[in-house]
Amino acid sequence: METTADVSMDVQPERLKNLLKALVDIYSPSGKEEGIVEYVGGYLKDNGLDFIKQKVDENRFNLVVLPKNEEEVDLCFVGHLDTVTAHDLENYGFSEEGDTVSGLGTADMKAGCAAMIEAFTVLVEKGGVLPPVGLALVVGEEEESDGAKTLMREYSFPWAVVGEPTDMVPCLGHYGYLEVLLRTKGKRAHSSMPELGQNAIETMLKLLLKVTEYITSMPKGVVYNIRQLSGFPGGFVVPDNCEAWLDLHLHPDSRVDVLKAELEQLVEAVDESALGLEAYIRFENTQSGYRISPKRPLVKKLKEVYKKLSLPWEPQDFRSHSDGNVLWAAGVDPIILGPGRLETAHTAEESVDFSQVVQAARLYLNFALSINAPFTRKP
């Protein structure tokens, strides 16, 4: 196959929409992706795309499409087939109104997966031989990224495009992520006599206030979310235990280790200053952010594709965490780029403009065709 763009090669919007509808209509929360993996495997086979089923656990698999020479993968397109759980199990499927298509996973990221699959379908139906690019459709991103971690244990490639929703803006920077557990202990008492106890929830609220005040005062800023707050035990008592889970998203240039140390010092100071209060902090999940130089040769190729398709080139940072963090930690340079807007993901109003899904498929296709020389990670 020629590895330069062929004007006769183009995506088929109707086929792409049918694929996206099928993907959205299959419920595939993290850990329960068997149905969608089976469907996508059949779709790839029917369209002439040979794939490898990579085992993640007993019943879950990644799907990996590689060129004939597996050692020649210079760029891998990566998408996750799982979603968060549905807000409404009776009403999560595909719907459309005008150019807008809605449903669980439309933005995050079944539209991106469908666009990637369509691009690869065009590649094989026109020439039969893939350029030095791969496609990895993984599971588990919304929980522990176990699909991406398994992928990186067996395969190696220098570059990736991860199809998270960026509104088609190329993200060369990626926020880091810190999952934080805070725990406070108080003194249990009868609920009608709170003065005899120490309410662990009240002390947690005071601790959270100090933590969030510190976070918002940081010069580069940290995006924080108090994800969960729970008091124990239940019943008619003053709770003597409280846990809070926080998601912290850090600017790409932030030092995760510095933030950890300062949070530990803050909690230690609160613990020492409050009579009877026991405060505890633990970091459950740490993912470093990163930034890719726009001067890298492959990034310049992507910029040329944007110019060819008359798309604005305005690189930004991706401010969530994703499989991109996992790939980066494994030595890959991941560019985050896909259809849809991050602000609609994980909401009951999740949607994407279908015209943008078509645009994504065309961009992925043209970018894949432009890859005709090896690219290695800068030392």
Model-flagged regions — what are they?
Residues 82-97, 172-183, 301-304:
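Acidic-glycine-rich active-site phosphate/pyrophosphate-binding loop
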Residues 110, 114-179, 378-379:
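Acidic/histidine-rich catalytic neighborhood of metal-dependent amide-processing enzymes
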Residues 81, 100, 136-145, 165-167, ...:
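Acidic, glycine-rich active-site loops and adjacent beta-strand->loop/helix elements
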Residues 76, 134-136, 280:
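A structural signal for isolated positions on well-ordered beta-strands in alpha/beta enzyme cores
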Residues 23, 27, 44, 164, ...:
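Residue-level signal for inorganic ion chemistry
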Residues 2-104, 128-129, 324, 341:
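Acidic/His- and Gly-rich active-site-bordering loop/insert found
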Residues 1-5, 11, 165, 181-379:
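Metal-dependent amide/peptide-bond hydrolase catalytic core
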Residues 98-107, 189-191, 232:
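A short glycine/serine-rich beta->alpha loop
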